[in-house]
Amino acid sequence: MTDNQRQSTTDGQPETRDPAQATAEAAEQTQATQASAAVEGELQDGSADSATGASLSADDGADPEALRQRVEELEKALADAEQKAEEHWDQVLRMRAELENARRRAEKDVDQAKRQGLEKVCGDLLQVKDSLEMGVQAAEDAEADREKLLEGSQLTLKMLNQVFERFEIEEINPQGERFNPDYHEAMAAQPSDEQEPNTVLQVVQKGYRLQDRLLRPALVVVAKKGDGGAGSGGSVDETA
C-alpha cells in the first residue's frame, strides 16, 4: 500500500481497491477452496477403498482350506445320499418282486388245493358209481333176489353218506321244524289245525350245505292257519 493510501486510511477515508485485483484475489481463493475440497474427497475415497479392500481381503482370505473342506463334506454327503437312495430303490424293487412272487405262489396253491379237493371227491364218488353199476347189473337178472338188491342199494347209499361226511356236506331235512328262508324254499302252504303256521309239514326235496355254505335249499310245504278245509296254496311268511 502507498503512503498516500495509508494517509487516506489514517484520515478516516475508505480504502479504494482495484476491481481487477479484487477479482483475481477472489479467483485465487475459490481455486484454493476447490483444491482443498478435492484433496479431502480423495482422502475420504481412499479411506473407503481401503476399508472395502480390507473387507474383501478378509472375505477372500477367510481360510480357503476351510472352504475346500466344506465343499468336500457337501460333496461326500451328496454322494452318500445318492447311494442310500439307490439302495432304497433296490430294496423297493426286491420287495415288489417278492410280493408278486408270493401272490403267484398263493394263487398256485389255491388252484392246486382246489384240484386236489376235486380229485379226492371224484375218487370217493367213483366207488359209489361202481356200487350203483353193480346194483343195476344185478337188477337186470330176472332171478335177482329182491332183498339182496335192497341191501346193495342201502350199502351204496351208506357209502355216499360217508363221502358227504368226509367233506362236511350236511343234509337239510327240516320235517316238523319252523320254516327258515335261509335254508328252505316253500313250494306251498296248507291249512293245519295241528301245527303252528310256518311249520314244515312235508319235505318235497332235501337240501344240502357245505359247512356254512348252502348248496341247495330244501323244498318244503308249510302250514298255515286252518280255515276249516283242506287244500293247498296260500302265502308263506318268508320272514319267519
Curated annotation (Swiss-Prot):
Q: Where is this region: Disordered?
A: 1-89
Q: What is its main location?
A: cytoplasm
- Compartments where located: Cytoplasm
Which residue stretches does the UniProt record annotate as biased composition, category Low complexity? 20-38
Highest taxon of source: Bacteria
Q: Does the keyword Cytoplasm apply?
A: yes
- Recite the UniProt keywords alphabetically: Chaperone, Cytoplasm, Stress response
Q: Which GO terms describe its molecular function?
A: adenyl-nucleotide exchange factor activity; protein homodimerization activity; protein-folding chaperone binding; unfolded protein binding
Question: What Pfam families has UniProt attached to this entry?
Answer: GrpE (PF01025)
Question: Listed disulfide bonds for this chain?
Answer: none
GO BP terms, alphabetized: protein folding
> Residue spans with biased composition (Basic and acidic residues)?
65-89
InterPro entries attached to this UniProt entry = GrpE, GrpE_coiled_coil, GrpE_head
**Cited function:** Participates actively in the response to hyperosmotic and heat shock by preventing the aggregation of stress-denatured proteins, in association with DnaK and GrpE. It is the nucleotide exchange factor for DnaK and may function as a thermosensor. Unfolded proteins bind initially to DnaJ; upon interaction with the DnaJ-bound protein, DnaK hydrolyzes its bound ATP, resulting in the formation of a stable complex. GrpE releases ADP from DnaK; ATP binding to DnaK triggers the release of the substrate protein, thus completing the reaction cycle.
Please report which protein family the annotation says this sequence is part of: Belongs to the GrpE family.
Oligomeric form and interacting partners:
Homodimer.
What name has this protein been given in UniProt?
A: Protein GrpE
